[in-house]
Swiss-Prot record:
Gene Ontology CC: cytoplasm; spindle pole body
Bias-annotated ranges (Low complexity): 64-75
Coiled coil: 229-355
Region of interest called Disordered, as start-end residue ranges on this chain: 34-76
Keywords, sorted A to Z: Coiled coil, Cytoplasm, Cytoskeleton, Phosphoprotein
Pfam families, sorted: BBP1_C, BBP1_N
Compositionally biased tracts (Basic and acidic residues): 34-48
Protein name in UniProt: Spindle pole component BBP1
Oligomer and partners: Homodimer. Interacts with KAR1, MPS2 and SPC29.
Subcellular location per the Swiss-Prot or TrEMBL entry: Cytoplasm, Cytoskeleton, Microtubule organizing center, Spindle pole body
Xref: InterPro entries: Bbp1_C (IPR029330), Bbp1_N (IPR029328)
Amino acid sequence: MNQEDNTGGGGIFGLFKWTKDALFGTDISPSMKYKDQEERRDRSRYAQDDTNFSMKFGNDSNRRSTNLSRSNSWSGLDSTLHRKYELLPEYNENGFNSIVNGDHHSKERIRSLRSPAPIVPREPLRNEPTDTFGHRLHTKRRTINELSNSQIPFIPPQEDDPLLSKFFNKDGVNEVRRSPYKLSVKDIPGKFPSPLTKRDEIDNYYVRDEDACHKNREYKKAYFDLFAQMDLNSRDLEDLCEDVREQREQFHRNEQTYKQAYEEMRAELVNELKKSKTLFENYYSLGQKYKSLKKVLDQTISHEAELATSRERLYQEEDLKNFEIQTLKQRLSDLELKYTNLQIEKDMQRDNYESEIHDLLLQLSLRNNERKDTSAGSNIFSTGQYDRTPFHNGNNSYDSNSHSWDTDYLKNIDGFIER
């Protein structure tokens, strides 16, 4: 008994020590001791019953207290859960993800996510705090209005809650019920007997002291088992939070990579569109030039066709004129030849006619001379003198008058021949 009292495991000394600690706060309670362990330094703001010792409530119940947010199943959601349940991602007032921009609220949510899971809800319905060993001396009770504005609604534990079932083991409860001693208020850890206790209970206290020490050991063992399980759960939760954080960082890195690739692709597409626009404008201008050139070419072809037709017509007219010229030249040459022949024939006929005329005139003159000689012979002594040059007198037919007569005669002959 004395050994147990010296170790603080139970008995009157242990009960007195716990009572003294609860009333005056002179020593550290088991919950505060667990909170101050080095391996649980992340739980510096919370006690064993999930009570926040750093909470400072004012009169303003509507103010935003992001530092008091507790880690729960809905804090620190990743994009997979948002996509699965079609939830909107968290964005700040600038329109960007608050976690990427280092928002204080998101950092607090990540810090709360790395904290261990709560055993009981943060906001109990009762006004009395569950931490009996030191919380009552340093905090004040919250009103019903403050409790109603809590972020996480209170969910009462189910009948088959594993923690409560492990803590309040049914076999142990049945064993206590089957024991000759009834379970009173003073047997519950954290609760102490009323000063108005009955005398028989005080007399029987020493008898039940050994059983109480045994129960305290069992309760302490259950506490430590729960604490160890909480520590393992916290470590698993930290690992899970670390994985979630890494996945989120990887997701944001991928998102930045995709965003950069999208920006590059968008810039490239804009450049291609500008080049396509310039190419289309150049193509349109070339098309207009092609149409104008084609129109000019069509006009040129039509003019060339007209020119070819005119040239062909001129060639035909030239050939016709050349033929006419050749024909006229041939006719002219024929006429010239004919004229030459006629001229030669005319000259020959004139010579013939002149010779005949000359002969006829000669004969006529001879006849005249013969007549004159005949008459002269009869009158040889006549006074008239015989002219021996009959061709030179005025009556001779071979004078100028005779020449004119011959010329007219020849003209008449030429006209007769031409006819």
